[in-house]
Design a protein with these regions (language model features):
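Domain-level cores of phosphate- or acyl-group-handling catalytic modules
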Residues: 164-222
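A short, flexible helix-boundary coil/loop motif
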Residues: 1-38, 53, 227-255, 305, ...
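Short, conserved catalytic/metal-binding motifs centered on acidic residues
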Residues: 46, 60, 73, 104-115, ...
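An anionic, glycine-rich sequence signature occurring as long contiguous blocks
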Residues: 205-304
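Short, solvent-exposed helix-loop connector elements
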Residues: 31-34, 281-290, 302-322, 339-343
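Short, positively charged, Gly/Tyr-enriched micro-motifs
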Residues: 8, 21-89, 149, 201-203, ...
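Electropositive, glycine- and tryptophan-enriched low-complexity nucleic-acid-binding patches
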Residues: 128-182, 271
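Active-site-proximal, Lys/Arg-enriched surface segment
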Residues: 70, 74-148
């Protein structure tokens, strides 16, 4: 008789949380010592549970009878982790099971997420500064790289940004990661934060198909986007790349539509996309394919809901919360694929990973 465990058709929350707690406990040694009043698993249970509930460490410890004291957990989160290790180990864990799930070729998306900082202006060291948004110029900023499979995001990497970091430096790291994957990349979709000469030069140098919305910089492109109908133009951006100024030329697809009162707007809406991909032949193709990336916005909203509620400005702890939130999503999709999804020809061997 076979001893293979059969999935019961769904993944239960306790199985998901136990799987991630076990994974963290196996991969990250906190070095608490034999005489510590709690062990690493206790800390990870609180951390993962708070992320899953979208609540604070303090609230979870207060309402759970068997949880350690909040101060004990928060102390170890502050003292036992550093930025480099959280980023390195976090990205390794994000990729560990995801790469098994991905098809032979995927579309990937790179995004910058700017979370506003409203604290003391004299305590913004280590934050990322950008143009004013939502009443501030200082942000807790994270770049994410993820594969999109059937409108679901599978996060491959997360990177925290501080002053001195640039979109191009982050993109260079992400493209280097993609170069090392066995999975093929059909195209890279980027948000407008990556629209500059350095990022476009990198994409061309790595020979990746790409699509991103343009920013209305300069009289030429503003004029192009204020008149005419759908068309393809050649455009140039100039910027410094490791010293001398470099000019990059690329096609811009301008797609035009009548607004017909949508959002109480009328007239012609013109959308410009920097794009170079074999499957994009017309401006409507560019808009259609870029719009598909918004199919994952529900996943991003989920990540915002499944992150620990906190007021801490500690960059290490905040990054840790983001990483665990992304791990929760990856693990759920991996477990669903491994244990619940319709078996393929030949089947899969399901092991009790959460037991």
């Amino acid at each position: 008789m076979s001893n293979t465990k059969q999935a019961d058709g769904e993944i239960h929350e306790d199985q998901l949380l136990n799987f991630l707690v076990n994974k963290l406990d196996e991969e990250v040694d906190l070095g608490l010592g034999a005489n510590a009043e709690i062990d690493a698993e206790d800390i990870y249970e609180v951390l993962v549970g708070a992320c899953a509930d979208g609540t604070s460490i303090s609230k979870l410890c207060e309402t759970s009878e068997d949880s350690p004291h909040e101060n004990t957990v928060l102390y170890h989160l502050r003292e036992k982790f550093d930025l480099a290790s959280v980023e390195r180990v976090g990205n390794a864990l994000l990729q560990k099971d995801v790469l098994e799930v991905l098809p032979e070729q995927v579309e990937v998306v790179a995004d910058l997420h700017l979370r506003p900082y409203y604290g003391d202006e004299d305590e913004t060291d280590g934050l990322y500064h950008s143009e004013a948004k939502r009443g501030t110029t200082a942000f807790h900023t994270y770049a994410t790289l993820y594969a999109r499979v059937k409108n679901k995001r599978h996060t491959l990497a997360v990177r925290r940004l501080a002053d001195g970091d640039t979109a191009s430096s982050v993109l260079a790291e992400f493209l280097g990661l993609l170069d090392g994957l066995d999975t093929g990349v059909k195209a890279v979709y980027l948000d407008r934060e990556f629209y500059d000469s350095k990022c476009l030069t990198l994409l061309q140098a790595h020979n990746y198909a790409y699509v991103m919305p343009i920013v209305r910089w300069g009289k030429t492109i503003k004029q192009e986007l204020s008149e005419g109908w759908s068309r393809i133009i050649q455009h140039k951006l100039t910027g410094k790349l490791d010293g001398p100024a470099v000019t990059v030329e690329f096609p811009v697809y301008i797609d035009c539509t009548y607004q017909n009162g949508r959002y109480d707007e009328h007239g012609v809406a013109r959308h410009g996309y920097a794009a170079d991909a074999p499957f994009i032949q017309t401006p409507r193709d560019a808009r259609y394919h870029y719009a598909k990336r918004f199919g994952i916005e529900a996943s991003y909203r989920l990540s915002e809901q499944s992150v620990v509620t906190t007021t801490t400005q500690n960059p290490v702890v905040r990054l840790l919360y983001v990483v665990v939130s992304l791990l929760l999503q990856n693990v759920w999709r991996y477990l669903h694929w491994e244990y619940v999804a319709t078996p393929r020809r030949g089947g899969r061997i399901s092991r009790a990973a959460w037991s």
